[in-house]
Structure formats: C-alpha cells, structure tokens
Amino acid sequence: MAHAAQVGLQDATSPIMEELITFHDHALMIIFLICFLVLYALFLTLTTKLTNTNISDAQEMETVWTILPAIILVLIALPSLRILYMTDEVNDPSLTIKSIGHQWYWTYEYTDYGGLIFNSYMLPPLFLEPGDLRLLDVDNRVVLPIEAPIRMMITSQDVLHSWAVPTLGLKTDAIPGRLNQTTFTATRPGVYYGQCSEICGANHSFMPIVLELIPLKIFEMGPVFTL
C-alpha cells in the first residue's frame, strides 16, 4: 500500500504491475534525456554570442528533428502497446468474481461458489480497531488465492465507478449496463487496498476496496470469507 511522502509507485504484486513499473522507468529515462537536451540547448543559446545571419535553411537539422521524435515515440509506443494487450488477455481463469459498484459501496459475487453475494462497506471511524486503516478498511474483505489467474467482471448499478487496486496494476471502469472484465494473478499473500477511481458523487472517497490474498492451498481447502 502507499505510505506518507512516498515517491514512486507501489510495490508490484502481479506480473502486470511489474511490467508497468518497468515501462514507467523506461519512459521516465527518455523524458529525462529530452529535458537534458532541451536545457543544454537553452544554455548554449543564452551563453553564446556567435551568430550567423547568412543561414537560409538547414536540411540536416530539419531531418534530425523530424526523425528523432518519431523514433522516441516508437520507443515509447511499442512497450505500451505490449502491456495494453497483456492486460486484455483472458487465459482460462481459475476463479471469476463479479463486482458491482453502487453509491457508495461494492457488491461482490462469487459465481463459482453457489452464487455467494455480499456487500462491502467502508468501516466508519467508530468501528475501527487498532491496526485498521481509516477510510481504507471495510467490513467484508474479498478473499482470493494467489498464484491463480482470477477474472473480475465489473459493472455498476447507478453511476460511473472505477474498480482500482494499484499494487496489482488494476483499474477498470464500472459502467451501468456494461460488463467489463480484467484478469490478474497475484504473486504474494497479504492485504491490499484500492479505491473507487472515478468521481461518483458526494461519498466518492468512501468506497474502498480490500483484497485479502491467501495461499492457493488454503483457499482450495474452502474459501475463507470474512463476512
């Protein structure tokens, strides 16, 4: 999860998030290089007093500043497209969970376990126990296994919402009348937090998401739901 004064992205808990962090560093390196070249050109312009008013054109320079940006865009676009297609892949999921957004809570349905349905509300401050996180903990967590592909089916019953868990690299819009899907495979156990990432009304900030990821062997013994 995020920490106060944190610089950078959250630690990755899925292969997709690992790819996103790598792409972030790749793009940031290119941006730093561009900024350095621009600042260097400005420095030379401000410090040199040599001028030449006889230059009418510069074909070589025009060729360079046309081709170079195109190469930079390709270097950014290709890895981005690769990750984009990876996020859309659905490869025989082991478990399917349906998430429905409401103002201002989430409903989850375990379609593979007899249609188990429950609501997940944010815990009010009066109900928080030592160790609970304000505005992030919920009354009913979503319990899922690690090391297994999981498909999330996401929709909304009223307005636009967005189901997002940063440490897993997930952010999928919940749209009324439309069923979106995303898949992920968690790589380590723990409790991971997310929030609604689409402004959805007065209590938009009070729609947390909590995933409790447990080892696959324990989950196969019988899903442990904190209801």
From Swiss-Prot:
Cu cation A1 binds at H161, C196, C200, M207. Its cofactor is Cu cation. The keyword Cell division does not apply. GO terms for cellular component: membrane; mitochondrial inner membrane; mitochondrial matrix; mitochondrial membrane; mitochondrion; respiratory chain complex IV. It is found in: Mitochondrion inner membrane. It is an enzyme of class 7 (translocase). Residues 1-14, 88-227 are mitochondrial intermembrane. Its EC number is 7.1.1.9. Binds a dinuclear copper A center per subunit. Cu cation A2 binds at C196, E198, C200, H204. One of its GO terms (molecular function) is cytochrome-c oxidase activity. The chain crosses the membrane at residues 15-45, 60-87. InterPro entries: CcO_II, CcO_II-like_C, CcO_II_C, Copper_CuA, Cupredoxin, Cyt_c_oxidase_su2, Cyt_c_oxidase_su2_TM_dom, Cyt_c_oxidase_su2_TM_sf. It is a multi-pass membrane protein. Mg(2+) binds at E198. GO terms for biological process: ATP synthesis coupled electron transport; cellular respiration; lactation; mitochondrial electron transport, cytochrome c to oxygen; response to hypoxia. Residues 46-59 are mitochondrial matrix. The keyword ATP-binding does not apply. Keywords: Copper, Disease variant, Electron transport, Magnesium, Membrane, Metal-binding, Mitochondrion, Mitochondrion inner membrane, Primary mitochondrial disease, Respiratory chain, Translocase, Transmembrane, Transmembrane helix, Transport. CDD domains: CcO_II_C. PROSITE patterns: COX2, COX2_CUA, COX2_TM. It is linked to Mitochondrial complex IV deficiency: A disorder of the mitochondrial respiratory chain with heterogeneous clinical manifestations, ranging from isolated myopathy to severe multisystem disease affecting several tissues and organs. Features include hypertrophic cardiomyopathy, hepatomegaly and liver dysfunction, hypotonia, muscle weakness, exercise intolerance, developmental delay, delayed motor development and intellectual disability. Some affected individuals manifest a fatal hypertrophic cardiomyopathy resulting in neonatal death. A subset of patients manifest Leigh syndrome. Belongs to the cytochrome c oxidase subunit 2 family. Component of the cytochrome c oxidase, the last enzyme in the mitochondrial electron transport chain which drives oxidative phosphorylation. The respiratory chain contains 3 multisubunit complexes succinate dehydrogenase (complex II, CII), ubiquinol-cytochrome c oxidoreductase (cytochrome b-c1 complex, complex III, CIII) and cytochrome c oxidase (complex IV, CIV), that cooperate to transfer electrons derived from NADH and succinate to molecular oxygen, creating an electrochemical gradient over the inner membrane that drives transmembrane transport and the ATP synthase. Component of the cytochrome c oxidase (complex IV, CIV), a multisubunit enzyme composed of 14 subunits. The complex is composed of a catalytic core of 3 subunits MT-CO1, MT-CO2 and MT-CO3, encoded in the mitochondrial DNA, and 11 supernumerary subunits COX4I1 (or COX4I2), COX5A, COX5B, COX6A1 (or COX6A2), COX6B1 (or COX6B2), COX6C, COX7A2 (or COX7A1), COX7B, COX7C, COX8A and NDUFA4, which are encoded in the nuclear genome. This is Cytochrome c oxidase subunit 2. It comes from Homo sapiens.
